[in-house]
Amino acid sequence: MTGLFSVQIDERCQKRLKQGYPWVFRSEVLNAKKAESLAPGSVVDFVRAKGDFVARGFYNPKPQLVGRVLTLTEKQPIEKFFIFHQIESALRFREKLFAEPFYRLIHAEGDGLPGLVIDRYGDVVVCQVNTAGMEALFPHVEAALKAFVEPKAIVLRNDTSAREQEGLTQEQKVVFGTLENPVVTITENGAQFQADVMTGQKTGWFFDQRDNRDWVASLAKDSAMLDVFCHSGGFGIQAAKAGATAVTFVDSSGPALQAAEKNALLNGVEKKCQFIEGKAFETMEKLRDMGQKFGLVSLDPPAFIKSRKDMAAGLKGYQKLAKLAAPLIESSGYLFIASCSHHADLKELTDHVAEGLATSGRSFQLIKTAGAAPDHPVHPFLPETGYLKALTFRFLD
């Protein structure tokens, strides 16, 4: 006996957990009424109706997604050494991947720690805790980071909507050390960028697009590039540094464009760069009407599909982007388009983008599909962790 509360689950759920699926929903819990008394984030055993062990994990009676599996091993306690092992294992893997300490260290379920995201910015570590279970275990997370990473500062960016669903409050603070400046400098694919770890989007930088930025930069060499939804310039600046002749950056956010300009200066490519503040669709229409042409167009929009109900409208959004991009792309040029909407699968996205390009009457080919960089591992039974999809098309004229 473990002394943990036993959450009884139905046969369908038992089968899914044994096959590797890591989530339990309230409708699958046989003693849900009794489990309502559990403190959010309690460690529990998920068991058959007769009491046989199936899995161990977090339980939060507040949301519909009540359970998150941590282990299928009955003898595995969930405490300090479990957390230490998971974080050390993840760190060793990243150290094999990257020569410099700028990466996602923990990718939630993908690294076996549901609801925990940790990004490393050199000696500054930024954490997002999105489940009540990880909130309860965070002292062990902090201790593990101090032991293995030895950071100068640990920052909590607990400002996500996911926390509200778990009944958690939002907060941003430095929980360890001193953050002398919230703007840190990172290196990615040989370029340098500034990231604000306190107020920047996500934790300050989108590490997931690292490999895609390198790929796009290689295609843009000796060509003019249009970087739409450029944010702080990750795609376009790496392309300029890799040999693009000129880069036009477009974003609706003034502060994002200011950050992109600073990053262009930081990399010595400012003379190649033009910055346009404006809405993506309208700006692309204006550039089309002006007869502008580019060897490569990069589109990295925010999520168009935030829930299932947004699916049809969101897919049409990607289709329209592709339709607007086609006349901007010169002969034998390229379109790179990314989606961070996990609700749309790869085929749906590909079909709609291709339909948008087809309106040009030009022949084209799909030359690459990609996802996030390997520091964002995908849980094999949880497609939500493989949210990022990136397509590259080449025109054949």
Feature locations, PLM:
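S-adenosyl-L-methionine
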Residues: 253-298
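C-terminal catalytic and target-recognition region of SAM-dependent MTase-like enzymes
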Residues: 320, 334-397
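Non-catalytic accessory regions of SAM-dependent methyltransferases
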Residues: 1-120
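Non-catalytic substrate-recognition/targeting regions of SAM-dependent transferases
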Residues: 106-119, 135-205, 214
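Mobile active-site "lid"/loop adjacent to the S-adenosyl-L-methionine
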Residues: 294-324
